[in-house]
Amino acid sequence: MAEAYIYDHVRTPRGRGKPDGSLHEVTALRLAEVALRALKERNDLDTRMVDDVVLGCVDPVGEAGGDIARAAALVADYGDHVPGIQINRFCASGLDAINFAAAQVMAGQHDMTVGGGVESMSRVGLGASGGAWPVDPHIAIKSWFMPQGVSADLIATKYGFSRDDCDAYAVESQKRSAKSWADGLFKNSVVPVRDINGITLLATDEHMRPSTDMQSLGQLKASFVQMGQMGGFDAVAVDAHPDVEMVEHVHHAGNSSGIVDGAAAVLLGSKEAGEKAGLKPRARIRAFANIGSDPALMLTGPVDVTKKVLARAGMQLSDIDLFEVNEAFAAVVLRFLQAFDLDMSRVNVNGGAIAMGHPLGATGAMILGTVLDELERTGKERALVTLCIGAGMGTATIIERV
């Protein structure tokens, strides 16, 4: 089996996913184009070598629909010969796109592939693509359907994480993100988004709130109380997990991931393809895995999939230097830390989605790039990237510097 190497990665800054966000006037297609074009230009890439473009997108409808990967490859001038495919595994779509691209190379069927993701949440709203799970009783009842926020609160209740625990984690995410930006740790990977006149619309993540503290978070009301109690989802949670007497609602806008716009792209290929292109590999894909998990708890997939991917790679937890666990909700990361008895010094060291935002289909590709940069900066060797996923799933990838 061939090895799949990571040659480079880029991302856009993350804009607030609201009408007043700096990227609201930029379509998902344009965001994807920015990332793909930057990847091509900074590597002087002969796109005749690119066999496919794989992009994750969680709500691929309207202007973000119709196989946005193919459209993005065309507008980014990759050439008529470069195909594209859009994939969707909810919040892990960007990481799964990279895994999909890596698998093509490892199977010997492709020489060079781009993986990544895009989401314009300010223009195509969360949940715009619909689906059977929340509306069809045939699946909703059987799988204990409840909104993700209620599931996050169920995790916090079941595993003993208080409102203060979740808020303290959020404060740390803000501090780490702000410091990483202040120290210039993202400058080599983030490409600004400009308008048609070349004027910069956004060059840094704009969702961050560096002044966040426990006092300011304490003033926010829990977001999912009414949904859980009036909507009946608390009762569903207790039915699914009878060891929980009642759901304690601890999550709110300040300790949950931010709604943002953004895109990312990662260049992968075989050793031979890299040599032909004159590129130096930065890392290799060691292993990747996917699992299904309890759909009621929904967001605990990173724990189980981490065990699976480590076993697949023949590694122990101690073999991993850094972990990126998507900060969908504070309790997701707290449960991961608890399950593996991990120190915070190895997890999300540059901050995460609570501070910088979670552009759904792009996030997996973004955080893989972030941790690769950190491995290089600190001289460390291996990292594990994982995301929780709606409907109860998990995806994980292990990368290793070369």
Explain the meaning of each model-derived region.
Residues 10-13, 24-34, 42-44, 168-271, ...:
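N-terminal extracellular/periplasmic Venus flytrap/periplasmic-binding protein-like
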Residues 12, 16-19, 102-159, 226-229, ...:
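Glycine-rich loop/linker segments at domain edges
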Residues 14-37, 41, 59-62, 85-99, ...:
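Active-site pocket-shaping loop/turn-to-helix segments
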Residues 22-113, 118-134, 190-203, 296, ...:
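Conserved beta-ketoacyl condensing-enzyme motif
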Residues 27, 57-110, 131, 143-150, ...:
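Conserved catalytic cysteine-centered active-site region
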Residues 87-118, 156-186, 265-272, 359-380, ...:
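Active-site-proximal alpha-helical scaffold in enzymes
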Residues 153, 189, 196, 286-355:
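Active-site pocket-lining segment
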